[in-house]
């Protein structure tokens, strides 16, 4: 990996959905929902197994499945501070675009 993510935390701002995400290791992450926007309860926290792949320098494909069964797939462009997110909750797909800031 060109960019070292392990041990770093970021704020993902996806419209009304706001999450603080920490890369615990290359295969594990943890998050806290700051503002759930109806997709998750505010304050929900979870540790998840990651499938994290570097696409090119500073751009990662990151996906995981949450305990609820919700799935999340991100394209995280740290060079440009942009996150593209596909989230499924209760079988419904949400496509979101937002910003990444180091926490």
What is the meaning of each model-derived region?
Residues 19-53, 89:
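N-terminal glycine/threonine-rich, aromatic-flanked beta-hairpin/loop signature
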Residues 9-11, 20, 49-51, 61-63, ...:
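Beta-strand secondary-structure signal
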Residues 14-16, 61-103:
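Beta-sheet ligand-binding and adhesion/scaffold domains
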Residues 6, 14, 28, 35-37, ...:
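Feature targets compositionally biased, intrinsically disordered low-complexity regions
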Residues 39-76:
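Contiguous, well-ordered beta-strand patches that form the walls/edges
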Residues 3-6, 22-30, 55-58, 76-83:
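Short, solvent-exposed coil/turn segments at beta-strand boundaries
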Residues 1-19:
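Tryptophan-anchored aromatic micro-motifs
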């Amino acid at each position: 990996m060109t960019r070292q993510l392990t041990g770093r935390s970021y704020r993902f701002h996806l419209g009304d959905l706001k999450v603080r995400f920490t890369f615990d290791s290359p295969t594990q992450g943890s998050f806290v929902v700051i503002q759930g926007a109806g997709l998750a309860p505010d304050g929900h926290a979870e540790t998840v197994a990651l499938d994290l792949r570097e696409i090119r320098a500073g751009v990662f494909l990151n996906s995981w499945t949450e305990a609820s069964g919700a799935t999340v797939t991100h394209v995280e462009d740290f060079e440009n501070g942009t996150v593209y997110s596909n989230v499924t909750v209760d079988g419904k797909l949400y496509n979101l675009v937002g910003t990444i800031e180091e926490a």
